[in-house]
């Protein structure tokens, strides 16, 4: 049922009239669906990328994307001048130092239609497969902290609860207490928004860990490592390349994290499973 007007409920969701069939019955009802729109990134007045994203927490998105993509190295190197939203999309006006802007001229974009991107604008295999500086963190958590964070993440996803159509990324301290959560239709975007929120709040990312409601792709592992998050736990599986990157970058990568169960793919020293090595878990 296309072409009908939609009523905004919150930036991340809209109401649509749908025909629902359930249990042998059919009815016309109002349904909540996830909002998705193009978000344009403009650095120093020059268009750079267009991402398909959920139109919430866009300042966090601007900062997190810029940090995880290596456009800037420090939050103070960036200023969000304006966030312009309109019916068809949103435009982010971002200022960065001239030398950083010049470097962007060497990177090309082809992002239309993607819900997030983790290797954006790289023109060679070597650039894509770069390894961030090795993570140095004394973080150590136990499996109870991981389970606690997963439970809290599930409870702090209002858009997902309404629509069932978005990903979430959360950051928890070493005790598993979730401090920040961000949602988006794109898993990369959700993590970028979280990274931006951490930077804006001046949180030391090395003192906690991230949990995500998606698989752990190479791009997700790269973003976590770039943001100096020492442990990334995903509810689904990682890819082989993500594991290799995590191993090289000093990132603890966890997959299939659900309740007290998980699989640790790299740097297991940061997770205390409460069992001896070799003992069935």
Curated annotation (Swiss-Prot):
The active site is at 117 (cysteine persulfide intermediate). Pfam families: FdhD-NarQ. It is found in: Cytoplasm. Keywords: Cytoplasm, Molybdenum cofactor biosynthesis. GO terms for molecular function: sulfur carrier activity; sulfurtransferase activity. Required for formate dehydrogenase (FDH) activity. Acts as a sulfur carrier protein that transfers sulfur from IscS to the molybdenum cofactor prior to its insertion into FDH. This is Sulfur carrier protein FdhD. The lineage of its organism: Bacteria, Pseudomonadati, Pseudomonadota, Gammaproteobacteria, Lysobacterales. The gene is fdhD.
